[in-house]
Structure formats: structure tokens, C-alpha cells
């Protein structure tokens, strides 16, 4: 963005739903749009409960939870909403896909984590809602929901297609 601004001083930079630190993004962007994540948490947990969830598993990464106050607040909102709705809340700090293990490593971690949670009796049955702040693992959550009969409530970003096309081998148009 700084390179573009050096060529055109009138360029306006807008960031929508930053995954990085607000401090970092706001030093680059002229305008930042973010969802009301407390409302998102309330809506997602309510939808999970409506679909029969008794457990809610949130996967996130350190870069989101520690570097981005919005995601940190999201974690707290999910926990509070789960308590209010009577759902067992489980947080799992997962592998960041930008590091050495990459996206495949992050996806593998999610699969192994679900197995560990079952083995350690942190969750049971198929009344388990899955959510992650990491867009690179959405297809893994969809696969787990499909293959194990779990609940995939929605992706982390406001799109109905994140992860679905990959799993169901559908071309996304538009």
C-alpha cells in the first residue's frame, strides 16, 4: 500500500475485517471496517444452539488472539455467550498457517485436535459446533462436520462459501 501511495498521493486505502493487529493496519489504512464481533458471537452461538449444539469449540491462533484486540474480545464474547446459553465452551490455540507447517499443517492440527478432545472427553457425541478465526481451516471444519456429524455453523468471515467449495468440489461463481 505504501508503494501505491508513493505513486498516487490521492489513493484511499480501506481494510475490511483485518486479521492482523489493528495498530498495524490502522497505520496503513485510511478506513477500517469491522463486524460487531460481540454480536457475531451471540448470533453464532445462538445458531449453534438452535442446531442442537451442547459443545462449542473455538479454534484460533496466537497472532489473532494476542495481536488483534478484536479477536481477543471475540474469544471472550464466545465464552460468555456459551455460558449464557448453557454450552460447554472449549478453546483451542491452533497452528498458525503462516509459519513452517503452512496451511496443510494447520488443517492437520484441527483434525488431530478434534480427536484429542474426544479422547480426553472434553467433548462427546455429535452435538459439537466448530468455529475458527482462521480462514485457511474452514474446509477442514466442513469436512469434520460432514464426516463426523458435527455442526459447522458458519465461516469466520461473512461468506457462505468459505470452505464449502473445496469440500464439495463446487466451482464458485461471482
Task: Show the residue positions of the predicted features.
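An alpha-beta-alpha
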Residues: 36-92
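Loop/turn elements at helix/coil->beta-strand transitions in domains of secreted/extracellular proteins
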Residues: 7-13, 27-29, 51-56, 83-90, ...
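Short, well-structured alpha-helical segments in soluble
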Residues: 1-5, 105-126
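Solvent-exposed loop/turn segments at secondary-structure junctions
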Residues: 18-23, 62-66, 96-99, 135-139
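Extracellular/periplasmic periplasmic-binding protein-like sensory domains
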Residues: 29, 78-89, 139-174
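Flexible loop/hinge segments that line or gate small-molecule binding clefts
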Residues: 4-38
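Periplasmic-binding protein-like
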Residues: 1, 11-16, 55-60, 124-135, ...
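Short beta->alpha junction loops
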Residues: 32-35, 92-108
